[in-house]
């Protein structure tokens, strides 16, 4: 079951520059006796040469399908390209098919059909039930950055032109500088700083959103931090609609909860809210607590307008629902994630005796058992 072969596949999602391994963690695995193969990539934040220099052989993008040894772990981040061929390898990635997302049966059924296994990164947990590695902080940070930019953009583009596309930033300082410039332009128009309300503020993702707000100079008095205590009475919450300019949703959705906002609550003439950033991006989840949009946005087109009933007064309102926000800061987010994942990766040789991987495989088998017969 265990193997010392790891094959880092190239990401195929547009604008996805992150990597499950960095040159540093790749070297640490090689030093520990692992055979690490790296697919070339034109979009990864790390150059191919950086991996070659630490001793990893480079192979062509997508070559894992035909060339990877049967016992190699196929390591990646985002979901595989849509396809139908059965999967025979053990894959380690975020597959987004365990919470009955749209099309989950088609995605998940590829592994049992090929005799392969999915070890989903989203569900790797430690003894206390906490995720061993997550992009939460980076997601919240990037989401809040785009939300502030969108708030300012709406003020400086009153004719309703949507927020321009964004490309990944080489480092965090460049992102902060860009957001500060937008913020100043927005403040010049409005004469004030935006009020930003973060739900899930005590979690990793929420802490990232709050930190961005502080880093770009939004006063603490304008950063409203909510968590389970503030939301336990159940929404919709008029405070989100009437007290905040920007709402950043950072919760981890595990069950049905009352809506935070909905079309009805947003239709009040007292609405102040103009930007929603749904970092959780549970767009197709039937329990989405922000049921005012139905598409996942992209870095090319970061926002989607919210359609309110005819005659509704007030400022424009748009949603950011990008589902790979940490790729806005690919270097820092990859380094943070890969470093946190390392202790688990180092157990892959002896996977059958490693709790984190045994638990991941048990969960895979449980989910496979729920597949409809036709999948």
Curated annotation (Swiss-Prot):
Pathway entry: Amino-acid biosynthesis; L-lysine biosynthesis via AAA pathway; L-lysine from L-alpha-aminoadipate (fungal route): step 3/3
Residue positions binding L-saccharopine: 18, 78, 101, 131, 135, 280-282
Intrachain disulfide bonds: 205-250
Enzyme Commission identifier(s): 1.5.1.7
EC class (word): oxidoreductase
Active site (catalytic residues): 78 (proton acceptor), 96 (proton donor)
Keyword vocabulary terms for this entry: Amino-acid biosynthesis, Disulfide bond, Lysine biosynthesis, NAD, Oxidoreductase
Signal peptide positions on this chain: none
Domain of life: Eukaryota
Catalytic activity of the protein: L-saccharopine + NAD(+) + H2O = L-lysine + 2-oxoglutarate + NADH + H(+)
MF GO annotations: mRNA binding; saccharopine dehydrogenase (NAD+, L-lysine-forming) activity; saccharopine dehydrogenase activity
Protein family (similarity comment): Belongs to the AlaDH/PNT family.
Record protein name field: Saccharopine dehydrogenase [NAD(+), L-lysine-forming]
Source organism (scientific name): Emericella nidulans (strain FGSC A4 / ATCC 38163 / CBS 112.46 / NRRL 194 / M139) (Aspergillus nidulans)
Lineage of the species this protein comes from: Eukaryota, Fungi, Dikarya, Ascomycota, Pezizomycotina
């Amino acid at each position: 079951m265990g193997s010392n072969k790891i094959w880092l596949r190239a990401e195929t999602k547009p604008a996805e520059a992150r990597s499950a391994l960095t040159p540093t963690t790749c070297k640490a695995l090689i030093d520990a006796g692992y055979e690490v193969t790296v697919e070339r990539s034109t979009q990864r934040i790390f150059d191919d040469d950086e991996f070659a220099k630490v001793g990893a052989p480079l192979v062509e993008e997508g070559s894992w399908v035909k060339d990877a040894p049967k016992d190699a772990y196929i390591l990646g981040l985002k979901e595989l390209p849509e396809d139908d061929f059965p999967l025979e390898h053990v894959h380690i990635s975020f597959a987004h098919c365990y919470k009955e997302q749209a099309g989950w049966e088609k995605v998940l059924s590829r592994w049992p059909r090929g005799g392969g296994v999915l070890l989903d990164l989203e569900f790797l947990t430690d003894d206390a039930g906490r995720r061993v590695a997550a992009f939460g902080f980076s997601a919240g940070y990037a989401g809040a950055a785009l939300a502030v930019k969108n708030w300012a953009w709406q003020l400086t583009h009153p004719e309703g032109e949507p927020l321009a596309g964004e490309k990944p930033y080489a480092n965090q300082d460049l992102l902060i500088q860009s957001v500060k410039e937008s913020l100043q332009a927005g403040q010049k128009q409005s004469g004030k700083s935006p009020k930003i309300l973060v739900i899930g503020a005590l979690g990793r993702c929420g802490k990232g959103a709050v930190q961005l707000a502080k880093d770009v100079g939004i006063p603490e008095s304008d950063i409203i931090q909510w968590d389970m205590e503030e939301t336990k009475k159940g929404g919709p919450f008029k405070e989100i609609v009437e007290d905040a300019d920007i709402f950043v949703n950072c919760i981890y959705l595990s069950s049905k909860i009352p809506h935070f906002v909905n079309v009805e609550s947003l239709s009040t003439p007292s609405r102040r809210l103009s930007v929603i950033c749904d970092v959780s991006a549970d767009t197709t989840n039937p329990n989405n607590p922000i049921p005012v949009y139905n598409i996942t946005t992209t870095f090319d087109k970061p926002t989607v307008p919210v359609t309110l009933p005819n005659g509704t007064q007030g400022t424009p309102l748009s949603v950011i629902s990008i589902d790979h926000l940490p790729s806005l800061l690919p270097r820092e987010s990859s380094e943070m994630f890969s470093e946190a994942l390392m202790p688990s990766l180092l157990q892959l040789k002896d996977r059958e005796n490693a709790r984190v991987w045994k638990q991941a495989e048990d969960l895979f088998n449980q989910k496979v058992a729920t597949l409809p017969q036709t999948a």
